[in-house]
Amino acid sequence: MSHPAPEAPAAESLDFIREIAQEDLRSGKHPVIVTRFPPEPNGYLHIGHAKSICLNFGLALEHPGSRCHLRFDDTNPAKEDIEYVESIQEDVHWLGFDWGTHLFHASDYFDQIHDFALELIAKGLSYVCDLPVEEVRATRGTLTEPGTNSPYRTRTPEENLDLFARMRAGEFPDGSRTLRAKIDMASPNMNLRDPVIYRIKKVPHDRTGDKWCIYPTYDMAHGYSDALEGITHSICTLEFEAHRPLYDWLIDHVSAPCHPRQIEFSRLNLTYTVMSKRKLLELVEKGLVDGWDDPRMPTISGLRRRGYTPSGIRSFCHHIGVTKYNSITDMGLLEAAVREDLNKTAPRFLGVLRPLKFTITNWPAGQIEPLEAAINPADPESGTRQIPFTGELLIEQDDFMEEPTPGYFRLAPGRTARLRHGYNVTCEDVIKDDTGRVIELRGPYDPESRHSKPKKGTAVIHWLSAAHAVPAEVRLYDRLLTVPDPNDIPDGTDWTSTLNPESLDILGQAHVEPAALTSPGTFQFERLGYFCQDSKHSQPGKPVLNRTVTLKDTWAKAQAKV
């Protein structure tokens, strides 16, 4: 399901990439902007990819006639899967963006990229190298020492063309030969030290079958795919800044139809989570999370399952902006953006997470009174709903304290509280079981209090009619990690030791307002936070609810006390 894309940012909020794009249009360098989002289909997209998606598709939306391509970088068939292709398309659509007819794959261009390789060989700008991968790596040198020329660097173009043809024909085993660009083994830029641009991989490809047993590297395929598609601005994260000279060199030395401009921006890093695809895969494979879409994961599918909204994520990506400086962003900013979005749109219901029975001693036997409450106070047009009120209620255990501490204003023996949308009740009796655990409160209600304002100091608490409440399992999620930055840990420490053992709290005795279970999307339980039904485990008659986000930033408050 797709969602409407956001409006273009206001002019005063232009980032440096948008300024470049606008200047290129003003100067006539380009009549339109053409960008691309080029994921590798070897994993699920995460919130960091959402930033790139919003930037690339956003640029196209902001300029009439412009477009953004979705291109799968499918140059490594051993690690790719159709599952990831489908999930990536679903995620991009869900975020509110559409590539229209501009869906491409790097494999669409394998023939043309191969022709470019032949062109480089014929010009004496690339050569077939017989060094094993480990030796290629060892002879690259260091940041302070030049690399060593391969003994195969002096092969003639004719010999290289013959060997490359035999590589394609499958004569040589995997890893035995590579095609390398002939640039400069003494370059201060390690990426220009005769990089590998083709390697032998006898692995069938999902789209091309057994046609190829040699595949271009990312650097080889990336720039040429951009050029063949007429991309104007090839936007990458900062780790590709050092690759830009190679990007330009490869395009400059063949008959490419155009030369896109590569621009780099800082990638998104969030506190208390991980963005590394390798680490996310480790969590999934070790069973440390409930799959790629675990609501604690930063994957888009995980955020969707948790109840985050596309507009909230887009708002967050716009708010953090686009810069050239790497930094780590507070997870609280993402939660705040989602919270702000949900406050405008989410319907309100009542739910009790840890129920405690309250019996109203003077309530007429069998009487059910419908009470009216707003569906969403932030949206007057949303209307109202009816909540049944009876003499046997469920309240939150936390809303009662037998021996109240200073500053506690909710129910206690002899104390009165206002029931939300309802009446004042007073606790007169406390019923306990044999272990001394409080199992029931009893007391009268004030029938005249329904339409009066609570007295100063009277707390307002939520409740449910015991006879009408529906049992549900509720899952409360918290930070995935206990440390802000999983990379900032002592050497030799297993990063998974920073996983938060309290990141999931499953409450099996919760009860909820029935209407909440028929509400699509994310909703608010008043006083508790925003919740949604779990798309993976919730079943008819056995609802499972996920807490999307609290009503306030309780994590920051808790950390301030540490």
What residues fall within each predicted segment?
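Core subunits and conserved enzymes of cellular information-processing
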Residues: 240-244, 248-250, 311-314, 318-321, ...
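A glycine-rich helix N-cap at a beta->alpha junction
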Residues: 84-110, 116-117, 124-127
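Active-site cores that bind ATP or allylic diphosphates and position pyrophosphate for catalysis
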Residues: 70, 74-76, 82, 119-279, ...
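N-terminal catalytic cores of NTP/NDP-binding nucleotidyl/phosphoryl-transfer enzymes
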Residues: 10-22, 26-89, 206-237
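Intrinsically disordered or highly flexible coil/loop and linker segments, enriched in small
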Residues: 30-31, 97, 126, 173, ...
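Conserved short loop/turn motifs at secondary-structure junctions
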Residues: 38-42, 71-79, 101-111, 134, ...
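N-terminal acidic, proline/glycine-rich, low-complexity intrinsically disordered segments
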Residues: 1-6
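Long, charged, mostly alpha-helical binding arms that flank functional sites
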Residues: 258-337
